[in-house]
Design a protein with these regions (language model features):
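Signature of N6-adenine DNA methyltransferases within the class I
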Residues: 1-174, 293-295
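Polybasic, glycine- and aromatic-enriched phosphate-binding surface used to engage nucleic acids
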Residues: 134-346
Length: 346
């Protein structure tokens, strides 16, 4: 059976809310169940299957399906089937009481070609032609003309790494004020560190915090029998450290961090920035000794790439305009500066 009209507000259930059995079943049944898919994406696919060729579908969903990687198969499916996205209306971010979901009302026509009408939250209206190959729609929907930025080279191609900082799984243990670190641990077992909050407050990657670190400069974990002063200190926190998922589920050593640090990249001169920011800003960490925490991202320029020119470009109005057009929205007008997106910056 097919339907002339389909209207829905499907459940927003991230992949973490699904059981392993559900994930396996959905991946076998739906083209769009790939990566970190959300349940509403599958509802959209099934609705498209049920839509008559000349029918019309209107769904309320989070706007992020328009640009996140997990929804690329759905965007590609629309293009492959020749389905016309007639209108996208970004309604108030807090339209659902108590939730900030950045909802979007999307109206789809079963068959057709042409431009898409876009209504943004600030009331501006424009029409655009959406990519039909699964690429992000963000820049098109937000009305940004960034064609002059195309250089044939992206940020990902001139950097060794663009990545989030380290997650220890127990910052309350591994992060200390420098003045409060036991003397026996200094300097061999500590590295300067910075959080997103400190970066914004200080305006610099320098802070009074350090990470107590059981890793060598090459990124290998020091063996337990060689821990010395670190081992004596860590024993007093052993119960807390053993209670982490990386130990209980992933089988990591009880004193290891949640993530294994790529020390050879971390301990390089780098550019750092907050993971969520209203107006993106980038700072130089020239000494190459700061290990950013998980709320701070960092990028390491390739050899031969001018550190200062890259830093200046990232803080330039044109680069900021690109981020405004392409980055995922967060609450209160903030942007998420995700490495996957930033690597595509021209």
């Amino acid at each position: 059976d097919s339907f002339d009209f389909i209207v829905g507000n499907p459940p927003y259930v991230p992949i973490e809310g699904l059981s392993e059995e559900e994930k396996a079943r959905y991946k076998a049944e739906f083209e769009t169940a790939s990566g970190r898919f959300d349940l509403y994406i599958l509802f959209l696919e099934r609705a498209l299957d049920l839509l008559a060729p000349d029918g019309r579908l209107t769904f309320v969903t989070p706007e992020k399906w328009e640009y996140v990687k997990a929804a690329a198969p759905l965007r590609k499916l629309l293009g492959a089937r020749g389905i016309q996205v007639e209108e996208i209306n970004h309604i108030e971010e807090d339209a659902f009481t108590g939730l900030v979901t950045f909802p979007s009302v999307t109206t789809i026509q079963g068959e057709g070609q042409g431009k898409t009408k876009v209504v943004l939250r600030d009331g501006t209206v424009h029409t655009t032609t959406l990519p039909d190959n699964g690429q992000s729609w963000a820049a098109k929907i937000r009305g940004a003309d960034l064609s002059e930025m195309e250089t044939g080279v992206t940020l990902g191609e001139v950097t060794t790494r663009v990545s989030a900082g380290m997650a220890t799984g127990a910052d309350s243990v591994f992060v200390e004020k420098r003045s409060e670190v036991p003397p026996s641990l200094k300097p061999d077992w500590v590295h300067p560190t910075v959080s997103g909050r400190q970066l914004g407050k200080n305006g610099s990657p320098r802070s009074d915090s350090v990470l107590i670190c059981p890793y060598r400069a090459n990124g290998t974990l020091v063996e337990e029998q060689e821990l010395g002063a670190f081992g004596e200190w860590a024993q007093s926190h052993r119960a807390r450290l053993e209670d982490r998922s990386c130990v209980k589920k992933a089988g990591k050593k009880w004193y290891a961090w949640h993530e294994t640090p790529p020390m050879q990249d971390l301990l390089q001169p780098k550019i750092v920035f907050k993971d969520i920011e209203k107006e993106p800003r980038f700072w130089a960490e020239r000494k190459g000794d700061v290990i950013p925490r998980h709320s701070v991202y960092y990028l390491v320029p390739d050899q031969g790439v001018s550190f200062d020119e890259l830093l200046e470009y990232l803080n330039s109005p044109i680069a900021q305009e690109w981020m405004e057009a392409n980055c995922q929205r967060a609450a209160n007008g903030f942007l998420r500066l995700q490495s996957r997106v930033l690597r595509q910056l021209p």
